[in-house]
Amino acid sequence: MDRLGPFSNDPSDKPPCRGCSSYLMEPYIKCAECGPPPFFLCLQCFTRGFEYKKHQSDHTYEIMTSDFPVLDPSWTAQEEMALLEAVMDCGFGNWQDVANQMCTKTKEECEKHYMKHFINNPLFASTLLNLKQAEEAKTADTAIPFHSTDDPPRPTFDSLLSRDMAGYMPARADFIEEFDNYAEWDLRDIDFVEDDSDILHALKMAVVDIYHSRLKERQRRKKIIRDHGLINLRKFQLMERRYPKEVQDLYETMRRFARIVGPVEHDKFIESHALEFELRREIKRLQEYRTAGITNFCSARTYDHLKKTREEERLKRTMLSEVLQYIQDSSACQQWLRRQADIDSGLSPSIPMASNSGRRSAPPLNLTGLPGTEKLNEKEKELCQMVRLVPGAYLEYKSALLNECNKQGGLRLAQARALIKIDVNKTRKIYDFLIREGYITKG
């Protein structure tokens, strides 16, 4: 007979009988061939030869009981559990009620056995001491330092960064200003009543379907932002800057296709092209060495050092190169001489030198989907597109200039530049636009 003690003397703590679903009372039967999970039977179902699915009445079995001694030869495991439960129910020291609940031991036997094996036993004392020491070792004596995280960023409410992030709330993983933020306005006046005509009912259902499609588009954009990690824009820009200029241009071009492919596939594509660029650059460098007749890296280091020295010497001849460049054009030569005179006198150059190559102007800013676009009129949208200024920033600058103009009774360009800490050319265009449209007056 195999004997195994239960965890508790309460029948509800034991598994139910698979035959009659009653709570098991010791002794009970466990099938040695079925399981997991274990297959338990009470004695009544076992004597009836209960069979269920794969379980057969001729399977080998184990008798589960707790009549074996643990701490004392005269105390069974079942009595040990009954003693502990009685002390927990009746309280320590109330040995008469403990003995009455146990029914098999006197109060003197209960007190003597409990004090000997559970209070004065050095084995239990050392075990409890070790557990206490281990618990104290886990608890730090000093305060746990708290470090704020910037991923995702947590800007202060109503700050410029918070508006640029459309009011992203990290604790809720949601935005204050949603994409298509006023989609719910189309539903505010819709009410389904029983006397609606079929056409009116179909029209209302079409409006609801359109609203559902707009919600799906909103969730799709949120998923793209979450999957590609676009919440932390600063971290995204730092990752982009670690690539060479050529790969950054590819990154900028392929960004619009990121919504089609997954984030992992998009990153693999960019990384593969970055690796290709590095390999091409290394091959070009090795080809340059071979063209110069260099066949080992020791000579290549000397070649690179001499090449760097020649480049520095060439840059020192910049003034002579400028003279040779503008000497054929009298007007350009006069401008260059005035510029050099200003530099020699310690003044900033008053006449900028024209570049032959010409700098390509930046394309107009696309305002589609940017927060605050719906608050602008057509002329303001054109201004934001030309100066490449997001609508939220423009509205903030406009409000600051209007408030200052109302306080002073007018506003000068110098005051506007002091209020708006951005590029002076953009400030001039905003100032001229507000003057031209009559929002502010000159001081």
UniProtKB/Swiss-Prot annotation:
Pfam families: Myb_DNA-binding, SWIRM, TADA2A-like_3rd, ZZ_ADA2. One of its GO terms (cellular component) is nucleus. InterPro entries: ADA2-like_ZZ, Ada2/TADA2, Homeodomain-like_sf, Myb_dom, SANT/Myb, SANT_dom, SWIRM, TADA2A_B-like_dom. There is a cross-link at residues 132, 138 (Glycyl lysine isopeptide (Lys-Gly) (interchain with G-Cter in SUMO2)). Zn(2+) 2 binds at residues 31, 34, 55, 59. It is found in: Nucleus; Chromosome. Keywords: Chromosome, DNA-binding, Isopeptide bond, Metal-binding, Nucleus, Phosphoprotein, Transcription, Transcription regulation, Ubl conjugation, Zinc, Zinc-finger. Zn(2+) 1 binds at residues 17, 20, 42, 45. The keyword Repressor does not apply. PROSITE patterns: SANT, SWIRM, ZF_ZZ_2. Residues 70-122 form the SANT domain. Residues 356-443 form the SWIRM domain. The keyword Acetylation does not apply. Expressed in all tissues, but most abundantly in testis. One of its GO terms (biological process) is regulation of cell division. One of its GO terms (molecular function) is transcription coactivator activity. Its main location: nucleus. A zinc finger (ZZ-type) spans 12-69. Interacts with GCN5 and NR3C1. Associated with the P/CAF protein in the PCAF complex. Component of the PCAF complex, at least composed of TADA2L/ADA2, TADA3L/ADA3, TAF5L/PAF65-beta, TAF6L/PAF65-alpha, TAF10/TAFII30, TAF12/TAFII20, TAF9/TAFII31 and TRRAP. Component of the ADA2A-containing complex (ATAC), composed of KAT14, KAT2A, TADA2L, TADA3L, ZZ3, MBIP, WDR5, YEATS2, CCDC101 and DR1. Interacts with CCDC134. Component of the ATAC complex, a complex with histone acetyltransferase activity on histones H3 and H4. Required for the function of some acidic activation domains, which activate transcription from a distant site. Binds double-stranded DNA. Binds dinucleosomes, probably at the linker region between neighboring nucleosomes. Plays a role in chromatin remodeling. May promote TP53/p53 'Lys-321' acetylation, leading to reduced TP53 stability and transcriptional activity. May also promote XRCC6 acetylation thus facilitating cell apoptosis in response to DNA damage. This is Transcriptional adapter 2-alpha. It comes from Homo sapiens (Human).
